[in-house]
Amino acid sequence: MELTLWTYEGPPHVGAMRVASSMKEIHYVLHAPQGDTYADLLFTMIERRGKRPPVTYTTFQARDLGGDTAELVKRNISEAVERFKPKTLLIGESCTAELIQDQPGALAKGMGFNIPIVNLELPAYSKKENWGASETFYQIIRTLLNDKTNEINNINPQRWKSLGRRPKVNILGPTLLGFRCRDDVIEIQRILSEQGIDTNVVAPLGSSPDDIKRLIDADINICLYQEIAETSCEWLKRKCGMEFTTTIPIGIKNTINFINEVHDKLGLPLTNKEELEHKSKLPWYSKSIDSNYLTGKRVFIFGDGTHAIAAAKIAKDELGFEVVGLGTYSREMARQVRAAAKDLNIEALITNSYLEVEDAMKKASPELVLGTQMERHSAKRLGIPCSVISTPMHVQDVPARYSPQMGWEGANVIFDDWVHPLMMGLEEHLIDMFKHDFEFVDGHQSHLGHTATKGLDNIEDEHGLKNDTLKKNGGVLWTESGRAELTKVPFFVRGKVKSNTEKYALSKGLPEISDETLYDAKAYFS
C-alpha cells in the first residue's frame, strides 16, 4: 500500500459500482465502513446523474467490530431486497471490509432469496477499478447465461441469412464513468444502422438482467472497450461460439477497419466502401496545406490501454505527429501497449505513478500531451498544451453536448481537441513575442478594470526566466542577451531549448550563456 496525492484507478469495488450503476433492475450490497461511501460522489458530481447509484452500504463503524458484523450484513441485505426488489443482487466487500472476512456473498446465498445472487470476490489489494468492472460484468453474464449457454454451443455469425432478418450485434463494454461512453454508443449504433445492422443489446450501460439473457440472440459481439468487455466476450465465444470484434473504431482508419471487420464476420457485403472516408473532416484537413504546421509535432500519450493505443495510431498515421512517449496505467493492457510502442520504436511506460509520468513527459519534451486529468495538471506545470483522451477525468470532460470519441463524429471531435491547443499555442507565442515591443499597448486597462502587468515580466515569470531563477544552473550564468533571446523561443519548446543550451555550455566549459551561445547550441543539436 502506498500514500499518494493522485490515483489513476480506484479499488475494484468502484469498478463493480460502475457496472451496477450502469444497469437497471440490479442492486449492489457493499460491505464497507462509513468512509467508503465516498464513491457516490463520483456519479453525482462527475457523471452528473440525476439519481444515486443502486448501492446499499453496510456502513459498519469501529464500535461494531467488537460485535457480530455478520448480522449487520444480513440485515442490510434483507432490507435492500425488500425495498428495491432487484431482479439480480450483487454482493461485495470494500478493501477495508475484506480484512474482516465476513464473507457476505455466502451469507446472502444462505438467506433463501428467489433471485440470482452474484458473489463478487474482488481482491482489493492486488487489483484495480477497471479489473473490478470487467470481473463484475463477466460474473453477471456468467450467472445469468450459464444455463442457456449449455443449450447453445455454436452460434453461426451468418445465421441471420437463413433466419430471414437483418444481422444483429451486441455492443459490450460501455459504462458510467467511462470516457464519452454514452456518446460513443450513439455514434456506433448510427454507423451500424447505416450499414443495415441492428443493435440487439448494449451492456452494461442501460441494460437489465433480462437484456443480459438476450445476448445470445445476437450474431456477433462488438467489444467496444477491451478493459471492460474482453473477458466476457472471450467467455461467450468459448461457451457459445459467438465471434467478437477486436478493432476499436477510434480514428478514421480504425473506423473503416472496424466496419470491414463487422461485415467480414457477418458475411455482409460492403457496398459503400468509397464513401466511408468522406464521413469526417479529419482526412480533408490532413491533406490540406494547413496541416503542414502539424507535421512532425512531438506528442506524448498516456491513458487507459484502449484510448492510448488508438491515440498513438491517429497521431502517427492520420495527423503526421511524432509519438515520443506512450504508456498506460492499466496493467491488464500492458502487453498491447508495449506492442504498440514497439511499432513506434519507443519504450512503453507502464506505471500508476503520476510522478513517473510527469518525469517521462519532461524528458520527452513534447509539444502536445494527450493524457488523463493528471497529465493535464502536469502539462500545465510544464507549459505544454494538453488534451484529455482517457479517464480519470474531470467534470469538464463529461460534456452535456454530443461529443463522442469513436466513429466519424468522434474523429471530428478528436481533430478539434488535439489541433486547437497547438494552434492556440502558436497564437500565445506570437503574443509572447510582441508583448515587449514598444508598439504593443502593454499597460492598457483590462475589461475587469485592473491594470495589466508588463509583458516581459509576465513572460519571464511564467517560464522561469527571471534573474533569481535563471541566474545559476550547474554553474552556468545567463546574460541579459541570452535571456532576451530565450524569450523569443516558442513557450511550448522553450524548456527543451533552455535545457539543451545549458548542457551545451557545460560541455564546452562556458561560464555564461549569451545569445551567441544559444545560436551555437541550436546549431550543435540540429
UniProtKB/Swiss-Prot annotation:
Lineage: Bacteria, Bacillati, Cyanobacteriota, Cyanophyceae, Synechococcales
EC number: 1.3.7.7
Transmembrane regions: none
Positions contributing to [4Fe-4S] cluster binding: 36
GO BP: light-independent chlorophyll biosynthetic process; photosynthesis, dark reaction
Active-site residues per Swiss-Prot or TrEMBL entry: 290
Protein name per its UniProtKB record: Light-independent protochlorophyllide reductase subunit B
Family the entry assigns: Belongs to the ChlB/BchB/BchZ family.
Cofactor needs: [4Fe-4S] cluster
Source organism of this protein record: Prochlorococcus marinus (strain MIT 9515)
UniProt keywords, alphabetically: 4Fe-4S, ATP-binding, Chlorophyll biosynthesis, Iron, Iron-sulfur, Metal-binding, Nucleotide-binding, Oxidoreductase, Photosynthesis
